[in-house]
């Protein structure tokens, strides 16, 4: 069993018998082996299942969270999205075998996409994954999409820099550099007007829009040949493809992969990007990580803040290059 992470995930032995029996009923076969899966950032119950009939499946579930947990389950939304978006998210999403809710558990049964494939991010892997991601967006760009999906979810990223300046919490961002906080604050003072102007444009981005996954990272995707398989769909929405790819690109870099500029170039081998929409998206994304990186750890989610600080560093370094800003040398002092 491969364990990566510190989230307190339940063992298969902790899954109630009634839940296991219903899994067998939905999948038409009892489970012969359940391998607990780590790798994501939430403590959801996740298992790769081998069935007695030789088939495989993936089990994902929310369950009654322990007292004091900061986890907010969204498995019910993900369930709904797998059902209503099935024709739009294939072949990228795993096949959906069924779901049920009982005893405080909400279970999704999906195609098993196998073990983690990234990181490491080689240039060849990153290019194949990125081109497939572009094909996903291209498949729905400009199409009529379900009305129940948000068209404004990306707007939530349009005001973080402004709010940090207004509340004075921008000092908390600079303090991430510890002894270099004065240098960090000077840099932030220089770039803040640029970031605020660009992030304001995010809510004004015009169509054409596409179906967005809105949370594409290596821990919720697998690369199978030239196809990027993407799971975890609770945040699916409609918006500019540029937002999805900007968030994805800096995440690749944060995990030791190629620089975002290369990722965007590979994406544009399949689908053109609008420079102004990338600019607005990148400003909004950097603001989000600036707002989150200094905050306390979330109970039950022990690795989230660390990964957000890594993404703050990769996204701000990219923004400095893209917007012709001074080099943020202070980022070297920011601990993961």
Residue ranges and their predicted role:
Residues 1-35:
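Juxta-kinase regulatory segment immediately upstream of eukaryotic protein kinase catalytic domains
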Residues 11, 15, 150-201, 324:
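Active-site catalytic-loop/activation-segment of kinase and kinase-like phosphoryl-transfer enzymes
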Residues 27-52:
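ATP-binding glycine-rich phosphate-binding loop
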Residues 57-99, 120-135:
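A conserved alpha-helical element in kinase catalytic cores
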Residues 70, 210-211, 223-265:
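Active-site Asp-x-Gly
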Residues 103-116:
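Conserved short submotifs of the Hanks-type protein kinase catalytic core
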Residues 116-155:
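Conserved kinase catalytic-core helix
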Residues 242-272, 284-323:
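Active-site activation/catalytic loop segments of kinase-like enzymes and analogous catalytic loops
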């Amino acid at each position: 069993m491969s364990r990566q992470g510190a989230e307190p995930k339940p063992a298969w032995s902790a899954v109630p018998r009634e839940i296991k029996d219903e899994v067998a009923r939905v999948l038409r076969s009892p489970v012969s082996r359940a391998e607990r899966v780590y790798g994501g950032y939430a403590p959801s119950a996740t298992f790769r299942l081998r069935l007695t009939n030789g088939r495989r499946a993936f089990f994902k579930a929310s369950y009654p969270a322990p007292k004091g947990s900061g986890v907010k389950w969204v498995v019910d939304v993900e369930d709904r999205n797998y059902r209503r978006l099935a024709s739009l998210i294939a072949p990228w999403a795993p096949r959906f075998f069924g779901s049920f809710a009982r005893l405080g558990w909400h279970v999704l049964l999906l195609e098993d996409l196998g073990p983690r494939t990234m990181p490491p991010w080689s240039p060849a892997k990153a290019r194949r994954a990125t081109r497939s991601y572009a094909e996903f967006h291209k498949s729905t760009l400009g199409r009529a999409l379900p009305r129940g999906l948000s068209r404004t979810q990306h707007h939530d990223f349009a005001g973080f820099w402004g709010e940090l300046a207004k509340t004075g919490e921008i000092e908390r961002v600079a303090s991430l550099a510890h002894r270099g906080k004065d240098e960090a604050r000077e840099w932030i003072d220089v770039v803040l007007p640029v970031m605020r102007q660009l992030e304001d444009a995010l809510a004004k981005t015009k169509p054409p829009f596409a179906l967005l996954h809105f949370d594409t990272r290596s821990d919720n995707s697998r690369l199978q040949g030239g196809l990027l398989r993407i799971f975890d769909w609770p945040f699916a929405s409609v918006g500019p493809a540029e937002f999805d790819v900007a968030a994805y690109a800096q995440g690749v870099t944060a995990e030791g992969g190629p620089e975002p500029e290369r990722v965007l170039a590979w994406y544009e081998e399949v689908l053109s990007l609008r420079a102004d929409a990338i600019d607005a998206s990148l400003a909004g994304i950097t603001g989000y990580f600036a707002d989150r990186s200094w905050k306390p750890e979330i109970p039950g989610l022990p690795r989230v803040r660390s990964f957000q600080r890594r993404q703050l560093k990769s996204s701000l370094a990219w923004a400095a290059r893209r917007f012709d800003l001074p080099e943020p040398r202070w980022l070297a002092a920011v601990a993961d």
